[in-house]
Each structure stands twice: as C-alpha cells, then as structure tokens.
C-alpha cells in the first residue's frame, strides 16, 4: 500500500513539474496558447498590459453569452481601460490587440505579416481566397493583376456611371419637396449598382430583383459571420453547420449564383463586341488587345484567363470579393457621411458653397479634376471615416516567430487585431476625439499627426486598392444630393447601437430628412 502511494506521489510530482515547465512556454488554461516573450527577457507586463479573463481559462470565454452589440462595447471598454495596445490569451492563441499608431505602422509594414488572421477563415466559404483573404504568392499575383484596374485613366471613365447612378438616386424623390429617408437600403442599392456597372461592366437595370436578393442574402451571410466571431463554440465548421449553418449556406448559394451570372453576361458582351469589330473589319483575334474604351475589372480577369494567369474559380473569387468590398464598405461610408451632413448644418453649408463654386448645376463639369478641388468635402468625408471606419478591426497572424519593434516576440500563429475604431478615437492623436471636426484634415494639421493614426483604408502592403474609387463614388453622390437637397437631422447619433463584425454594423435605422433646395 505504501509503495503504491509512493508511486502515486511521484507521478503527481512529475505531472506538477511538467505542468510548471510547460506553463513557462504555454498558457495551459488558454488551451495551450503559446506565450509571448520579450526581447530582453523583461517581464511581459512591463511592455504590454495583460487582460485578466472572466474565468480561470484566461480570455477564452470572455465573449461567451454576449450579444454582438455587447461585444462591440466590451472591446471599446478594453481599449479605454488598458490605455495602450494589450495582450490576451484565448482558444489556443496569443492575441496582440493594437490601439496605437506606432504598433499599427510596424505591423502593417512588416514583411512577414501579410497573412490575415484566423477569423478571416470564416470568410472562405463566401469569398474563398480572393485578394482580401489570400496570402503570400497568390496574394502578390492577384494584387498585381487587380491594381491596374483602378488606374486614374479607368477611374475617369467610371465617372459618367457614378453621375448617372447618383441622378437615379435623387430621382427616387421626384415630386417630393420633403422626405424622410432610411439610408441603409437605398444607399446599398446605389453602391451595388455602381460596382456592378463600373468594375463588372454590367448594368443591373434588368436584374434589379436579383440585385435585391443579393443584398438580402449578403445580410444573412454577414449575420452568420458575426455569430461565429462572437461564439467560440461556432468556430468549428461541423458545430456551426449542425446548429445554424443551413440558412448561411442557402444564402451563399444565392450570392454565388448572382456573381456567376454577372461573369457569364460579361463574357457574352465581350464576345459580342469582338463580333461587331469583325463585322466592321477592325477585328483582331484578341478582344483584350483591341478594346480601348472603358476596361472593367472583370474584363481584366477574363483576359488574364486567356493568358493562363487565372482560372474560372479564380475569377469568381475576385468578383465575389470586389463586389462585397465595393458594395458594402462604401455603403457604410455614405450612410454615416449623409448622417453627419444632417447633424452639422454649418459644415454642410461649407460643403454646399464649395460645390457651388466648382460644380455647374447641370453637372457637366463633374469630373475627377473638379472633384479634386472639393477640399472641404474631402475633409468632411475623412472625418466621417475617422469616427465611423467601415472596417473597424483588421486581423493578421504570424506564420513564424516574429519580433516587433516594441520588444515583443510573438510566437507562430499569434493573432494580431488592429482596432481601427480605437486608433481613430485615441486621444493621443486626436484632441476631443468624439467631436466631429473636419478641419483636423487640413494639411498643416495632418503634418503634426502620426500617419497611421488614420487608416480607414488600411495601410502598408495590404492597403485598399479601391480607396480612390471609393472616395470618387462618395464625393459624386454627395455633390449630386447637395445640389438638389438640404439634409436635416432625424437621428441622435448617441442612440446608435454598434455591433461587432467584419465591417461596421449597427442596429438602428439611420434616417435623414431631405428638403428640396428650391423649397427651403
């Protein structure tokens, strides 16, 4: 009996010793998350705040039971309480949460940190591995291929589409001198129409019903993604599909069918153009060589397929990615931009007077050159995106042990969360950060500020290739609306309930009142 107890005691001591030894390198209770080290061996908490978890399992279950709006509030509170970029251990990962510009600059420019975080894996059923979610060689190839499609010459040719869609937007209120507008649905229809006609070369006039179905099912997909983000139990594909995945998968089918139809229609149009050129004896065997007019992004992909640079699945990946990004993120910027126009009458008047100075009432000179003269409108939009960034959080992960400038050594598979929302409201860079002040973006004020204190389009290697496109689209719609209407407030911005998500989500119906200018 004594020998048996002795062996049990030895076994217990061995296990305790093993746990002690392993726990130096791994946070065992965080499901063996490998620990972050410091370059000079200093205590970790001397370099970065450590967030204590709700349970003994580190931060694994901090979000469990919280709604999407509660998670959003929780993240903002963590940033406020820590006062600096902070560290968590959760579900087998170390998580470095960045809320300062210096660390953001280091990470976004680090040559080994181009791979998106594991959360982006939840996007793979929707976007697969297009330019947003791809990494390493595939990302470099796709990025190079797509960047040329946002060249200034091509953006110039898109302007007539933005004007036409903007006029179509205001024509919805023809015959109405005053109207209260719920922005989200109407603006998202405008941005979807615009991205389809510019980047895809397809008008949605005859596909309006299918476009509405796309938007409705996009919303279902977005809700499904958000549900997975906040509930670690749903991180496993099998568990998620078993309990709540059928609705999500049905929505995926609808949006993928829509994008495939867009691709098929564009292929037909390109072939018809080739036939027309043959008929007029100006034909060349290669439609990609002879085409001199507007060159939609989808055309570039179809031509790259002919050269063996991409296949049909690759085209679908990029079409789904560009449609989602171009439709959703710009829509968010416009919703909050128009809301702010309604809230800040003096700033709205400055925008209007600037527009009147540079843009004719018939819009005949509403081109890129004239848009570039609307400096105050640009500051207004930038300040809107500071307070309400379309992408409130960006994720990266380490593929190997990585040393940062701040002295932290992140182990392989560490997750890095760059909280754009908090950087944009960090009092270190922004005086009275909650106040709306477009003059923050005057050139002399920007010079005093860290360049990575404002990153609504990301920055560094993986910055948004469509940021000029987005600014052009937002400016054009705002010009057309302000030419026709004065925008009055309906909603109190303090009542807005934000929700966590890949993009900035909110529960409220954000509304404004449009009053026709000749009736004011």
UniProtKB/Swiss-Prot annotation:
InterPro entries: Cyt_P450, Cyt_P450_CS, Cyt_P450_E_grp-I, Cyt_P450_sf, Cytochrome_P450_Monoox
The EC number(s) this enzyme carries: 1.14.-.-
Gene: Cyp4p2
Task of the protein: May be involved in the metabolism of insect hormones and in the breakdown of synthetic insecticides.
Compartments where found: Endoplasmic reticulum membrane; Microsome membrane
An MF annotation (GO) of this entry: monooxygenase activity
Key word Flavoprotein present: no
Cofactor: heme
Upper classification of the organism: Eukaryota, Metazoa, Ecdysozoa, Arthropoda, Hexapoda
Membrane topology type: Peripheral membrane protein
Key words, A-Z: Endoplasmic reticulum, Heme, Iron, Membrane, Metal-binding, Microsome, Monooxygenase, Oxidoreductase
UniProt name for this protein: Probable cytochrome P450 4p2
Pfam families in alphabetical order: p450 (PF00067)
């Amino acid at each position: 009996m004594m020998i048996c107890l002795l062996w049990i005691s030895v076994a217990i001591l061995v296990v305790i010793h093993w746990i002690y030894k392993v726990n130096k390198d791994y946070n065992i209770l965080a499901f063996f998350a490998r620990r972050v080290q410091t370059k000079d061996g200093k205590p970790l908490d001397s370099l970065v705040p450590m967030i204590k978890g709700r349970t003994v399992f580190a931060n694994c279950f901090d979000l469990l039971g919280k709604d999407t709006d509660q998670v959003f509030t929780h993240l903002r509170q963590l940033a406020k309480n820590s006062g600096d970029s902070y560290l968590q251990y959760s579900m087998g990962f170390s998580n470095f949460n960045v809320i300062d510009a210096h660390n953001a600059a280091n990470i976004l420019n680090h040559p080994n940190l181009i791979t998106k975080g594991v959360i982006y894996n939840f996007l793979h059923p929707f976007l697969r591995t297009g330019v947003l979610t791809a990494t390493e060689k595939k990302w470099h190839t796709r990025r190079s291929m797509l960047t040329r499609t946002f060249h200034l010459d091509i953006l110039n040719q898109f302007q007539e589409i933005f004007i036409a869609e903007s006029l179509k937007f205001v024509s919805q209120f023809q015959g109405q001198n005053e109207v209260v507008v719920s922005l989200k649905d109407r603006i998202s229809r405008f941005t979807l129409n615009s991205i389809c006609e510019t980047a895809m070369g397809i008008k949605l006039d005859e596909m309006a019903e299918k476009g509405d179905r796309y938007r409705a099912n996009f919303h279902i997909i977005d809700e499904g993604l958000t549900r997975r983000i906040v509930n670690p139990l749903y991180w496993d594909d099998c568990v998620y599909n078993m309990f709540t995945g059928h609705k999500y998968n049905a929505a995926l089918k609808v949006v993928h069918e829509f994008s495939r139809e867009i691709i098929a229609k564009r292929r037909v149009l390109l072939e018809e153009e080739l036939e027309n050129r043959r008929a007029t004896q100006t034909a060349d065997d290669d439609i990609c060589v002879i085409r001199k007019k507007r060159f939609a992004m989808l055309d570039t992909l179809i031509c790259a397929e002919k050269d063996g640079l991409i296949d049909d699945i690759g085209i679908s990946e990029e079409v789904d990615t560009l449609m989602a990004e171009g439709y959703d993120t710009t829509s968010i910027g416009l919703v909050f931009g128009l809301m702010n126009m309604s809230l800040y009458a003096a700033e709205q008047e400055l925008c209007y007077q600037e527009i009147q100075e540079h843009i004719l009432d018939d819009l005949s000179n509403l081109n890129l050159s004239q848009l570039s003269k609307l400096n105050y409108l640009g500051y207004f939009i930038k300040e809107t995106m500071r307070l309400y960034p379309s992408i409130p959080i960006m994720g990266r992960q380490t593929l190997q042990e990585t040393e940062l400038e701040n002295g932290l050594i992140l182990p392989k598979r560490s997750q890095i969360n760059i909280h754009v929302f908090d950087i944009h409201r960090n009092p270190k860079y922004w005086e009275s950060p909650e106040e709306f002040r477009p003059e923050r973006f005057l050139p002399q004020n920007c010079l005093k500020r860290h360049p990575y204190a404002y990153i609504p389009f990301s920055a560094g290697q993986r910055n948004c290739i469509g940021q000029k496109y987005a600014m052009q689209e937002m400016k054009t719609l705002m010009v057309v609306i302000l030419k026709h209407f004065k925008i009055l407030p309906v909603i109190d911005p303090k009542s807005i309930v934000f929700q966590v998500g890949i993009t900035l989500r909110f529960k409220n119906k954000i509304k404004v009142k449009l009053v026709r200018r000749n009736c004011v």
